[in-house]
Amino acid sequence: MRLRNIPDALERIQNQNLLVKTPWNIDDSWIIEIGMGKGKMISQLAFDNPNKNFLGVEKYPSAAVKAIKYVKKYNLSNFFILISDAKDLLDRIKGKASTIWLTFPDPWPKNRHYKRRLTYKDFLEIYANLLVKDGILKLKTDNLKFFEFSIESLKENGWKITYQTNDLHNSLVNSSNIKTTYEEKWVNLNYKIHYLEAIFI
């Protein structure tokens, strides 16, 4: 579905004091979601973990502005937004996080676009530099081919997969899973969600 443009989206995010100034300094208390969309999952994580800090990275202000309603709903003070393309994160963030989430990234299914996939080696190198030692990269996707590509890419580029499942909602980790807006849509259509956790070694 096409994202409706909201002309004043960036201004509205700024007015809520959610927009970070770059370079933004972080430490191991931070958890990052890349491609947070409307922010449903990360805002719930922020509410459930008040002693952690959360940074939602989103390329499109018109999507990110939707997170404001969750900030108000949960009265969050530990959640912030960075408007950025993933390829620019090492210039925008200084320090290392404990966890990075990739939630339903564009699978770029055409072979000629494989370098755009967020689990291509160039992006994995960025994540490795943004995570503390033994920091965790977590991936959720509904696209099996993208999931299989991601597994191979991780293995080929110095990562160890510590957990994986092709059916997240019938897995051991489902009890702690928080659904994204996109995830809820596909689960209602009986799609299986693929999930993995990995560390850089």
Curated annotation (Swiss-Prot):
Gene Ontology MF term list: tRNA (guanine(46)-N7)-methyltransferase activity
Pfam families named among the record's database cross-references: Methyltransf_4
Binding site for substrate: 110, 142, 180-183
Catalytic activity: guanosine(46) in tRNA + S-adenosyl-L-methionine = N(7)-methylguanosine(46) in tRNA + S-adenosyl-L-homocysteine
Class of enzymatic activity (EC top level): transferase
E.C. number(s) listed in UniProt: 2.1.1.33
Any one GO cellular component localisation term in the record: tRNA methyltransferase complex
Key words, A-Z: Methyltransferase, S-adenosyl-L-methionine, Transferase, tRNA processing
CDD domains from the UniProt entry: AdoMet_MTases
Recorded family membership: Belongs to the class I-like SAM-binding methyltransferase superfamily. TrmB family.
Protein's recorded name: tRNA (guanine-N(7)-)-methyltransferase
Species of origin: Mesomycoplasma hyopneumoniae (strain J / ATCC 25934 / NCTC 10110) (Mycoplasma hyopneumoniae)
Lineage of producing organism: Bacteria, Bacillati, Mycoplasmatota, Mycoplasmoidales, Metamycoplasmataceae
Gene coding for it: trmB
